[in-house]
Amino acid sequence: MEKIRTRYAPSPTGYLHVGGTRTAIFNFLLAKHFNGEFIIRIEDTDTERNIKEGINSQFDNLRWLGVIADESVYNPGNYGPYLQSQKLAVYKKLAFDLIEKNLAYRCFCSKEKLESDRKQAINNHKTPKYLGHCRNLHSKKITNHLEKNDPFTIRLKINNEAEYSWNDLVRGQITIPGSALTDIVILKANGVATYNFAVVIDDYDMEITDVLRGAEHISNTAYQLAIYQALGFKRIPRFGHLSVIVDESGKKLSKRDEKTTQFIEQFKQQGYLPEALLNFLALLGWHPQYNQEFFNLKQLIENFSLSRVVSAPAFFDIKKLQWINANYIKQLTDNAYFNFIDNYLDVKVDYLKDKNREISLLFKNQITHGVQINELIRESFATKIGVENLAKKSHILFKNIKLFLEQLAKSLQGLEEWKAEQIKTTINKVGAVFNLKGKQLFMPIRLIFTNKEHGPDLAHIIEIFDKESAINLIKQFINATNLF
């Protein structure tokens, strides 16, 4: 059996996006499922659009997710270089070789001419295509242009009567007629290869066997098959085009939509666990056989199958991601949870100094992502307790609140062990004496300790206070009720 070799080939023109991440994950899982090799190649020839941290963003964030390349610019193998910018001479030579074989030609058309043709096609309700002005240019005219050092691109001659077909790994048989294509540029005027030309040469040189990528590349595949044919490359990878990822409105995720979190760095900053995010992204377009929702990396590799990859749009459901992440958070040990959550903890409770760990643990079973801890603390604790105001509120609601609290303080004072279970039992026993239960029992106590009517388990909150502080707080409240 041939060794499966897949690749992920991003351009460092931006930061790692969920769409590119899903592509990388699927290629990684396919390779590893068959004990193959996963390669990361950087398509960095668009120097004007490349950003400084573009390459690091790709590698650092994929590594954070557990997606590690067998070969890359940082871990080169025998199929380099892994930066397209280091291979420009190879592309250029092959482009000129195609001219010699009459399979490509120099195009001297100006940008203005091409733009004029494009606008005219649009005005005539036609798909803009290159009209072949230079395809059959006489050799004397070519020589004249070259003597004047006129700039030119190199275009591939597309056979309009041909058909370009492949059995798509995701979508089945796809056929695109040559008449739907145009003579594409394979080498730009600055001598740099275009995407479609360079990617064919790279995939061939690196012996890539399978290519999974976004649906937007379907038309590119037809062009690339034409390039494979022109170059005489017999070993052609299998192509699969993944589903479109859509937002809640059904529109394709757009990197320009700043309202939607969709870059991996953003998810890191907001406190999503890498295992949870990997799990979620792997389910975007891949449907496990047994409707299982939770997979670690090993399980993903074992279960991944192209037969379960679908072409229907994949809904990027942030609520599902939060649900998955919450489940992963719950599975953390208390120590691991606090080490995780402490990275995001900004809000402090001024009357519970040095209790950050205990306070954070109150929310372990309800938090969906790291930064949410601050919102939950703000909702559950006041920064300063206004005893008189709270006493007045409770006094109006519960006329016998003072007697109840006096007995509660006395009973709590008698506890030998200051634990949530014992505290809860004591509250219920005292409440029963005064025929208090539910809201009437717990809300006044919660107001005392948090200044809020709702929040985490009350007994665990009280446990965070040492016994003396808790009882003193209740007594302050009792004294305040004397005002009413």
UniProtKB/Swiss-Prot annotation:
Signal sequence, start to end: none
Motif 'KMSKS' region location, chain numbering: 252-256
Keyword tags: Aminoacyl-tRNA synthetase, ATP-binding, Cytoplasm, Ligase, Nucleotide-binding, Protein biosynthesis
Record's keyword annotation contains ATP-binding: yes
Keyword Transcription attributed: no
Binding site for ATP: K255
GO cellular component, one term: cytosol
Reaction catalysis annotation: tRNA(Glu) + L-glutamate + ATP = L-glutamyl-tRNA(Glu) + AMP + diphosphate
Any one of the GO BP annotations: glutamyl-tRNA aminoacylation
Single GO molecular function: zinc ion binding
UniProt-listed InterPro entries: aa-tRNA-synth_I_cd-bd (IPR045462), aa-tRNA-synth_I_codon-bd_sub2 (IPR020751), aa-tRNA-synth_I_CS (IPR001412), aa_tRNA-synth_I_cd-bd_sf (IPR008925), Glu-tRNA-ligase_bac/mito (IPR004527), Glu/Gln-tRNA-synth (IPR000924), Glu/Gln-tRNA-synth_Ib_cat-dom (IPR020058), GluQ/Sye (IPR049940)
A Pfam family of this chain: tRNA-synt_1c
Subunit-structure text: Monomer.
Protein name per the record: Glutamate--tRNA ligase
Gene behind the chain: gltX
